[in-house]
Design a protein with these regions (language model features):
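A short, structural micro-pattern
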Residues: 37, 115-118, 143, 154, ...
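Substrate-binding/charge-relay-adjacent region of secreted/lumenal peptidase catalytic domains
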Residues: 1-86, 90-123, 172-230, 253-255, ...
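Polar, glycine-rich mid-to-C-terminal structural blocks
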Residues: 119, 123-176
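Basic/polar, cationic surfaces and motifs that engage anionic cell-wall
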Residues: 290-294, 306-311
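An often Trp-containing, charged/polar helix-loop segment at the C-terminal end
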Residues: 132, 153-155, 185, 200, ...
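Active-site-proximal beta-strand/loop segments in catalytic clefts of secreted hydrolases
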Residues: 45-50, 79-83, 124-129, 146-157, ...
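C-terminal substrate/ligand-recognition segments
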Residues: 211, 232-251
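Short, electropositive, low-hydrophobicity segments enriched in small/polar residues
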Residues: 85-88, 129-130, 237, 241, ...
Length: 319
């Protein structure tokens, strides 16, 4: 993160507060480029970790750093994760309902992901082509329609079920830009959410909901050790969305407009740029489904998957 800011954001010189910069001691920040290079205009993060594993002070401090980047015209995009309502490696774990701490088990209360829980980044969930979808001209042409469903994949080696991560932060309140969307989802899913709450899986903390958007998370072809293979997950979704934003930034720069920076208020202000994903859900902590994909924003696929041309039309006019 240090490399993304100019020197005025490098912080204090008190080593008990911030690292000394520049620092000539072994392991110091001698080689960092804080203040020496122009920061990238889009940052894509294919990483997620249990929010509960970090202190509130760390989460808030780091989230403010993301906000600073947004104010500098840098868009920060992160994959929501592939472990549904669990978080961590090997399919993820859940929270102890009694303590709220990591239970190191696959049952209990939903465990939100970091950094997707930060309201100042754009979280990207996962979709896939509907397995049983019949070709439909209407689906191909109707504004906002989708032949996608929420991402779900069973690992061929570990036999673990992976689904698009989504849920609600236990540390950050829902920001103003998404309150109406989150409220509509909770109202639409009231009966289901009440069952999840009664079973100890979910507690309505009024937290920031994620993901914000979603994109294809299946069948990415890569070369591994000289052989072609396919991979799955939102670690592919996030950089594809980041590429779209980079292209839109280029179009804005041609018009002498600034880069977009923090995206979310503009995305939530108009859902017309997205294909609404209403099929599927995610899983975790003994709940199947956990959260469901629904019309409008949902805690599985967010606002839906972007249509590039419509997204360009929306974001090219942002001041």
């Amino acid at each position: 993160m240090l490399a993304a800011f100019d020197k005025f954001y490098c912080g204090a010189l008190d080593p008990s507060v911030d690292a000394i910069y520049p620092d000539s001691r072994p392991g110091g920040y001698n080689g960092s480029d804080c203040g020496t290079v122009t920061p990238p205009k889009v940052v894509s993060i294919s990483f997620s970790w249990p929010e509960v594993d970090f202190s509130s002070s760390y989460l808030e401090r780091q989230c403010l750093e993301f906000l600073k980047l947004g104010l500098m015209g840098v868009t920060v995009i992160a994959s929501s994760g592939d472990t549904g309502t669990q978080s961590g490696i090997s399919g993820g774990t859940c929270l102890d309902p009694a303590t709220g701490h990591n239970a190191t088990s696959k049952t209990g209360r939903f465990s939100p992901q970091w950094p997707s829980s930060c309201p100042w980044i754009t979280s990207v969930g996962g979709t896939q082509k509907q397995r049983a979808a019949a070709p439909s001209k209407a689906n191909n042409t109707e504004l906002g329609s989708s032949r996608e469903e929420a991402f779900r994949y069973i690992g061929s080696i570990d036999n673990v079920t992976y689904t698009s991560s989504g849920g609600f932060s236990n540390n950050f309140a829902a920001p103003a830009y998404q309150r109406d969307a989150v409220s509509a989802y909770k109202q639409l899913q009231g009966e289901h959410l009440s069952r999840l709450e009664a079973s100890g899986h979910y507690a309505d903390s009024g937290g920031r909901g994620y993901p914000d958007v979603s994109l294809l998370a299946s069948s990415y072809v890569i070369s591994l050790y000289g052989r072609l293979t396919s991979i799955y997950g939102t670690s592919g979704s996030a950089p594809v969305f980041a590429s779209m934003i980079t292209l839109i930034n280029n179009e804005r720069l041609k018009l002498s407009k600034p880069t977009l920076g923090f995206l979310n208020p503009a995305l939530y202000a108009s859902s017309q740029a997205f294909n609404d994903v209403v099929v599927g859900g995610n899983e975790g902590c003994g709940a199947e489904p956990a959260f469901k994909a629904t019309p409008g924003w949902d805690a599985v696929t967010g606002l839906g998957s972007p249509d590039y041309e419509r997204l360009l039309g929306l974001l090219i006019d942002v001041p």
